[in-house]
């Protein structure tokens, strides 16, 4: 999530939380945000985010970690996870990976980033808010 605009800039759907899945998402985010500006990456302290592969993939970024057992440090993404479940996924009986992928894609790419307003973004969508800057 690009915190300033509350925009999901990269995501990966997997049935496990392996380091390779996390690295794939980081690589997507890097490709999306091709910039030389200093970047801060925030995560919690689970194994995937403290591994050597993670450190290598994010070596040019400033690392920021949540305190152990304190999800409020990562409240924006925790809120997003709650929203996608409550507003969208809980409405469906997901039958397989392909169906789940389509649902997540629809929510993020055709609603959350493009239509859903956020008070933080002056009641604009993340895409519209980001265009201002």
Regions found by a protein language model. Give the residues of each.
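Charged DNA-binding/catalytic regions of mobile-element recombinases
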Residues: 1-133
């Amino acid at each position: 999530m690009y915190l300033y605009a509350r925009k999901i800039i990269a995501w990966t759907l997997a049935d496990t939380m392996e380091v390779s899945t996390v690295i794939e998402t980081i690589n997507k985010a890097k490709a999306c945000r091709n910039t030389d500006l200093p970047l801060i990456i925030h995560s919690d302290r689970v194994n995937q985010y403290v591994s050597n592969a993670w450190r290598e993939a994010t070596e040019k970024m400033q690392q920021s970690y949540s305190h152990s057992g304190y999800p409020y440090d990562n409240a924006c993404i925790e809120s997003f996870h709650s929203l996608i479940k409550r507003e969208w996924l809980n409405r469906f009986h997901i039958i397989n990976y392909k169906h789940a992928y389509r649902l997540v894609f629809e929510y993020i790419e055709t609603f959350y980033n493009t239509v859903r307003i956020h008070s933080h973004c002056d009641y604009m969508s993340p895409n519209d808010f980001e265009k201002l800057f």
